[in-house]
Swiss-Prot record:
Highest classification ranks of the organism: Bacteria, Pseudomonadati, Pseudomonadota, Gammaproteobacteria, Enterobacterales
Name assigned to this protein: GMP reductase
Active site positions: C186
Gene name of this polypeptide: guaC
MF-aspect GO terms: GMP reductase activity; metal ion binding
Residues annotated for NADP(+) binding in this entry: 108-131, 216-239
GO biological process per UniProt: purine nucleotide metabolic process
Keyword Cell membrane appears in the UniProt entry: no
Subunit-structure text: Homotetramer.
Enzyme Commission number: 1.7.1.7
Organism: Buchnera aphidicola subsp. Acyrthosiphon pisum (strain Tuc7)
Length: 349
């Protein structure tokens, strides 16, 4: 047993210090990024936000809406091959270029993804989707996928420490997904006692990845656009959103009505709801590590995305970053004990 004495930080523990700026308007800020990758020869450009590969969020409908903003969607792994076939046949090149195909680590998953990628050469991204990226099994599976798909952009995770980021990149990952337990419907940290505050995980993992010409995705923990800015400021190349995109018509799940108000169900992928839906039961050796909540129905995701991007542009303006790429080097975090004045929060409509 050992104890690390350094205090690790989450988004709520810091604010970004404002700095002198020559920008006159938020409209001058360019949020697009352009990345080359360690293994794939592809070049990616767009806004580096990704809809999470949760079954309620990473839907084909979400792909169609977010592609208009040049934003990626990690499509969940529970669609059948026939559903993929129908989607690919009916989708344009522009839409397919914004799809990340998520898979598990079983032989069935590997056979399925081989069939999916035969449907179109416009599919370029793979996400190996497991909760615990520290397993030897994911490393061996990642090597298998990289050998079979040498030209695809592959991300793998989830991890929260630099040494495992390095291991995954050296095993074939272009991008590593960072985050254990920060999600809005994740209870891993309280159920297992395992995790890592997200901002510190980003800072440490980004340093490890960038030293090997890799990238990271910050996955989880963002509740407002300011958190997204902090993730980019800490060194994240991409930010993945789940809860912030929940409750929209592009999400899967039924709309329920109670007392004249509409809601959608949102749950973690290790929750009782998810396990019963896809496995029919909770395995005797498992415990739920997620929660199920009702989210007020919010209509189209378009207005939420515009609000997020507007907040991100404003963050850049406050520190003088004309491009999102400049935000990290323009960021100075200050430790704080408060984030906002909450006196009237109870009166919000």
């Amino acid at each position: 047993m050992r104890i690390e004495e350094d205090i690790k930080l989450g988004f709520k523990d810091v604010l970004i210090r404002p700095k002198r700026s020559i920008l006159k308007s938020r409209s001058q800020v360019n949020l697009a990024r352009c990345f080359s990758f360690k293994y794939s020869a592809s070049i990616w450009s767009g806004i580096p936000i990704i809809a999470a590969n949760m079954d309620t969020i990473g839907t084909f409908e979400m792909v169609k809406s977010l592609s208009k903003f040049n934003i990626l969607t990690a499509v969940h792994k529970y669609y059948s091959f026939e559903e993929w076939k129908n989607f690919v046949c009916l989708s344009s090149k522009e839409i397919l270029n914004h799809v990340i195909v998520s898979i598990g680590t079983s032989n069935i998953d590997f056979l399925k993804i081989k069939k999916i990628f035969l449907l179109s050469s416009e599919l370029k991204y793979i996400c190996i989707d497991v909760a615990n990226g520290y397993s030897e099994h994911i490393v061996s599976f990642l090597k298998l996928v990289r050998d079979y798909f040498p030209d695809k952009i592959i991300c793998a995770g989830n991890v929260v420490t630099g040494e495992m980021v390095e291991e995954l990149i050296l095993s074939g990952a272009d991008i590593v997904k960072v985050g254990i337990g920060p999600g809005s419907v994740c209870t891993t940290r309280v159920k297992t006692g395992v995790g890592y505050p997200q901002l510190s995980a980003i800072i440490e993992c980004a340093d490890a990845a960038h030293g090997l010409n890799g990238q990271i995705i910050s996955d989880g923990g963002c509740t407002v656009s300011g958190d997204i800015a902090k993730a980019f400021g800490g060194g994240a190349d991409f930010v993945m959103l789940g809860g912030m995109l929940s409750g929209h018509k592009e999400c899967s799940g039924d709309i329920i009505e109670e007392k004249s108000k509409k809601y959608m169900i949102f749950y973690g992928m290790s929750s009782v709801s998810a396990m019963q839906r896809y496995e029919g039961k909770i395995a005797g050796y498992r415990a739920s590590e997620g929660k199920t909540v009702k989210i007020p129905f919010r209509g189209s995701v378009d207005s939420t995305i515009r609000d997020i991007l507007g907040g991100l542009r404003s963050s850049c303006t406050y520190v003088g970053a004309e491009k999102l790429k400049e935000l990290t080097k323009r960021t100075t975090f200050i430790r704080v004990t408060e984030q906002e004045n909450c006196i009237f929060n109870a009166f919000k409509e």
